Amino acid sequence: MKCIDELSAGELKGKRVLVRSDFNVPMGADGEVADIFRLKRGWETIQYLSKQGARVIVASHIGRAPEESIEPVARALKKLGAIIYIPDIVGPAAKGAVAAMQDGDIVLLQNLRRDPREKKNDESFARELASLADIYVNDAFAVAHREDASIVGVPKLLPSYAGFLMRDEVAQLTEALHPPRPSLAIVGGAKFETKDPIIRSFLEVYDHVCVVGAIANDCLKGKGFPVGRSRVSEHAPAREVCENPHLIIPTDVTAERSDKQAFVKKPQDILPDDKIVDIGPDTVATLAPYIAEAKFVTWNGPTGIFEEGYISYTSAIAELIAKRVEKGGLHCVIGGGDTISALKESGIPEEKLGFFSTGGGAMLEFLLKGNLPGISALG
């Protein structure tokens, strides 16, 4: 995989460069971008190309509904630098705007998924996108596990490179595939069936794996503890997973009654009316020595239902990691949109925790397979 900075300024000046970014960002109630984390991470590549004199054509999808407009993203990006929004993808307006570009200009195309051919990896759509540019750059790690036209189709048609975000993600997560020892993985999530493969993989590679979030309920239930009305998966964890000596499950939990009052309890004390919403202080204390000794931590998934305000124990673990990182000798890779959102609410700066991955599903798939379709497509 070649990175775009392997080309000289002379090789980029005047060239039309199609940058596949991932600007699928959350929107607030006012219809504007609520979190610019991904925008700031993706802007580095775009700004670099612009300064090299390239004509930068940025493409991304947003949301799940194909009719959703990417215009709010354009407004947010304008706070980072000069950008022209084109409400078109490969039609006359897009072609005309690209033809009128000057060296250093940046344009943002409309939501790629407005064209149904994008998700179908349609060859004709890939050709139309490729016709806009001379060079292709994939900087969209978070969707590199998708086989969409802009991810795997266009690279077949143009000289293709990784952007800086993609390069950094691959480097960081490659280290997480074979972490220095001692190592710790913290894995959360809502559905055990989606996390089962990565937990099994981590149990073979990491010294200890701690399960948190709703998937911890599945492990508690698998070990015979009551879980009340807590969320559990249809796919129950296998006995060999629950009883693996390297697996850490919560030693206490925060349980919410139907009247919304929450209490810290031991797992065996959960009542039928209780809903587990987070871990507890004893679990944090259990993790503390593992974090203190670790040289590498991978973390994907908050400890509790953060959207309902249960972030105190996510924050407590983050504080332990931040202190250990500051002391030196620990590197931490953190991923998953919910994890990062919860950590931002904790107020601990990103640089004090380690590397924040933009990928959720892509991060886990890379850690499971060591590659992704969008990375393979870059050659």
Where are these regions (language model features)?
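Active-site loop-to-helix "anion-binding N-cap" substructures in soluble metabolic enzymes
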Residues: M1-G379
